[in-house]
Swiss-Prot record:
Annotated source species: Shewanella sediminis (strain HAW-EB3)
Cofactor(s) listed in the protein's UniProt record: Fe(2+)
Record-listed E.C. numbers: 2.3.1.234
Function: Required for the formation of a threonylcarbamoyl group on adenosine at position 37 (t(6)A37) in tRNAs that read codons beginning with adenine. Is involved in the transfer of the threonylcarbamoyl moiety of threonylcarbamoyl-AMP (TC-AMP) to the N6 group of A37, together with TsaE and TsaB. TsaD likely plays a direct catalytic role in this reaction.
PROSITE patterns attached to this UniProt entry: GLYCOPROTEASE (PS01016)
The protein, known as: tRNA N6-adenosine threonylcarbamoyltransferase
Binding site for substrate: L134, V135, S136, G137, G138, D167, G180, N272
Catalysed transformations (reactions): L-threonylcarbamoyladenylate + adenosine(37) in tRNA = N(6)-L-threonylcarbamoyladenosine(37) in tRNA + AMP + H(+)
GO annotation, cellular component aspect: cytoplasm
Amino acid sequence: MRVLGIETSCDETGVAVYDDEQGLLSHTLYSQVKLHADYGGVVPELASRDHVRKIVPLVKQALADANCTLDDIDGVAYTKGPGLVGALLVGACMGRALAYSWGKPAVGVHHMEGHLLAPMLEDDVPEFPFLALLVSGGHSMLVGVEGIGQYEVLGESVDDAAGEAFDKTAKLMGLDYPGGPRLSKLAAKGETGHYRFPRPMTDRPGLDFSFSGLKTFAANTIAKEPDDEQTRANIARAFEEAVVDTLSIKCRRALKQTGYKRLVVAGGVSANTRLRTTLAETMQAQGGQVYYPRGEFCTDNGAMIAYAGLQRLKAGHIEDLGVKGEPRWPLDTLPAV
């Protein structure tokens, strides 16, 4: 089976073609980073309009790169949610229109299921069951995964997601958008031990996260310290260490609770070098293994949507002609495959 996947949940337009025998045949991506940089964050209306401009050329490019015609495509998958409703509707309209005009089945994919399954695009594929840590700009959650669609949300953020905390703290430090990667780059120049940030909600039972307090702590620290490059780097280092330690502590707690020996880490924050190193050490100490998608599949992309959609289309999960976007969509409400 061969599926065209479309991703438009936020500020990346991604289109890919995935074949269940040959693997990933093409992967095209357009980022709106330059468009939103002047505003310090994503402007939903501008994001939607830019998706409209870019999506048709990217579909054509993905088909050409895969050496495919419409006759070679067996189904269409598009991100149905969660995300920015206007952006979602652009991808949903395109996906539904292509499916209808080509006479192919279509399915709306959960954005976070796409991230969760992104490591399946690699050569070293995790076996079920496993624990998934999903960390992005909009979500931070720990999920017990018994199979595709068999998800138990063990813990999630009660306020800011980890990626959101990175971006907001970066903005407080005067760093350009996108702030998270720039903060991590600055943190690499910092020295440890100068500041001690809290590790939120690690002093109590449970697996939920809270990162808004870290942002406030960072704001207060920035306000009272000298505004020189090394001080800013030291603050960035302390902030990053606090986020990574918090995620690591919760992962260890969840692994002990579930007994799983495999950990999948996905979403935009999974590209963070310190997080990868820390969790690799954690799993090695526990005799387990950690799995990540490659860097280009940590952020939003069409390849993960094509893969996830293919699994659901093969299981007969076909949607009607209605065009729907789900800005809020609990992961654990998905049907099993």
